[in-house]
Amino acid sequence: MGRVDPVSVVVDDGVGWSAWPAPAKLNLFLQITGRRVDGYHELQTVFRLLDWGDTIHLRVREDGQIHRIGESVTGVVEADDLVVRAAYLLKYATNVHLGADIFVEKRIPVGGGFGGGSSDAATVLLVLNALWHTRLDVAVLAALGLRLGADVPVFVHGCNAWAEGVGECLTPMILPGAAYLLLDPGVCVPTRELFLDPDLTRDASPATIGDFIAGTAFGNAFEPVLRRRESAVAGALDVLSEVGFARVTGSGSGCFVEFSTRDEAECALERLPYGLCAWVADGASRSPLLDVLKTMEF
């Protein structure tokens, strides 16, 4: 028995650098209710923020340039990196003369459905808005974030939420305290391929927040497709099913089980076979980034 944590890369914070949390998320429920005329799918989901995630290191530049420090975990070129795009988006929207150096201390597995890229981008938007003194309100920042990805707005708002539309129409939710046993199967399936899969259910009956609270809205539309396509995901779900109700987050491939307490989650972790990339995180009542920003003076 044992555990393997996701790899963490650390940068030495020197003069001018500051470090900021970029929390992960889970989708506690996800279904597809239809398809819009523009080709995008209508979703219903519940976003749960976690107290665990990446750390974004930022340093303001006076010369207006924006650079990512270090290599991207995914090998994405700098201009296409979401954190760089987020910084440029804010810069052009506000016509600010300042720039930034950005380093991502990565913990959230790439392509796991834990929201790492979206959360990183949201943290850059929120923090540079403060460091650059551009003072855009949250609604404007969320609208900018939506141009980067459908999951970015929930991280900008920083609260657990019921989401509809493509995931951007948010209703804040108060969720009970919980701890989560997370497992990364180590595979990445492009979301576009999953949406094109003929076995994906795209016409689920619309649910309500009340349905979710009552426990009649649950599961993830992508799970049966992922089980069929990816043996690693099927295996991860089977292993987790030995300790609780196993679910997929987002479009996968990450999986999780919810527990009432951290002690229960830690005990379940110890029961897993050795060598799995599994760990425990607590659910957050709101983004830890908001708490950090609230204590800072700019």
From Swiss-Prot:
UniProt enzyme class: transferase
List the molecular function annotations (GO) for this entry: 4-(cytidine 5'-diphospho)-2-C-methyl-D-erythritol kinase activity; ATP binding
Active-site residue list: K25, D151
Please tell me whether the keyword ATP-binding is annotated for this protein: yes
Task: Please report any disulfide bonds recorded for this protein chain, giving both cysteine positions.
Answer: none
Q: Which residues are noted in the entry as ATP-binding?
A: P109, V110, G111, G112, G113, F114, G115, G116, G117, S118, S119
Which Gene Ontology biological process is one annotated for this entry?
A: terpenoid biosynthetic process
What pathway does the UniProt record associate with this protein? Isoprenoid biosynthesis; isopentenyl diphosphate biosynthesis via DXP pathway; isopentenyl diphosphate from 1-deoxy-D-xylulose 5-phosphate: step 3/6
Q: What is its EC number?
A: 2.7.1.148
The UniProt catalytic activity note for this protein reads: 4-CDP-2-C-methyl-D-erythritol + ATP = 4-CDP-2-C-methyl-D-erythritol 2-phosphate + ADP + H(+)
Q: Which Pfam families match?
A: GHMP_kinases_C, GHMP_kinases_N
Swiss-Prot/TrEMBL keywords: ATP-binding, Isoprene biosynthesis, Kinase, Nucleotide-binding, Transferase
The family annotation for this protein states:
Belongs to the GHMP kinase family. IspE subfamily.
| Primary role | Catalyzes the phosphorylation of the position 2 hydroxy group of 4-diphosphocytidyl-2C-methyl-D-erythritol.
Q: What is this protein called?
A: 4-diphosphocytidyl-2-C-methyl-D-erythritol kinase
Native species of this protein?
A: Xylella fastidiosa (strain 9a5c)
Q: What is the lineage of its organism?
A: Bacteria, Pseudomonadati, Pseudomonadota, Gammaproteobacteria, Lysobacterales
Gene name tied to this protein: ispE
